[in-house]
Amino acid sequence: FTHHNSVGKRENATPVVLEMEGELKPGGFTGIWKEGPRSGKYGSQFTEFSAPSLMRHTLRTEQFTTLTVVYAVPTTPGRCRLMARFPFIFSSALPRMFFKIVPRWWSHLNQNAILEDDQIFLHKQERVIENAKVVKKQSYSQACYMPTKADTYVSAFRRWIADIAGGSPSWPEGMVDQLPPQTVSRNQLLDRFHAHTENCKSCSVAMGNLTKIRKALRVVSLVALVTSAAAFAKSLSPKVTVAFAVVAAVTAMLREFMGGLVQKMK
């Protein structure tokens, strides 16, 4: 629902029938979505929760295998450090070659956008659930209405937390076991620079390089524009005037495009 126009569209929504494979255990659970994504185009998707913090989706076809591998490690109440990988294993050499030449920071732009689709919802809903637990003395199943098969894995994970893991992470002695106040600033919740970029070698280096290139492009664009104007004023060859004008325009557009990439890293 939250990933509208990022990995799907709400108007294309269909029932997601998730099933447990076996019982919930101290070590986690496994499940299957028999139809799988894209209305069954790629076959069944398998899910594994390996306690306490690993979630893995696996989708296998004749052409490729793709995995979503996520570790979510609680750091303080209301915060987790997320470590995610999205491996693709191709039977053909051409897709493998393509994925190797795509810079890691480029793929991070899209992956972070998908994570941020959930950020505001999770931040606020966590406090609603905490209020139901502390003030209303409700369990998670009482506080949340989850009538569909799409809720199967969430329900199983919450039962693992409540029945097996003691209800919450084991925080270090002396740590305040309370959620911090709700953040009302959208910019603070979606602060990609401090949440990811400054800690990611690929993204931080790319951001620095893009900033330097933009400065150089600004100089080139201005010089080309001035040269084009001077050539026109001196009635030089129209080809010279047009050539420098084109250089000025192209470098300005490149600078604008790179500026958009830098903004996405902030």
Over which residues does each language-model region extend?
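Rieske [2Fe-2S] iron-sulfur-binding subdomain
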Residues: 1-266
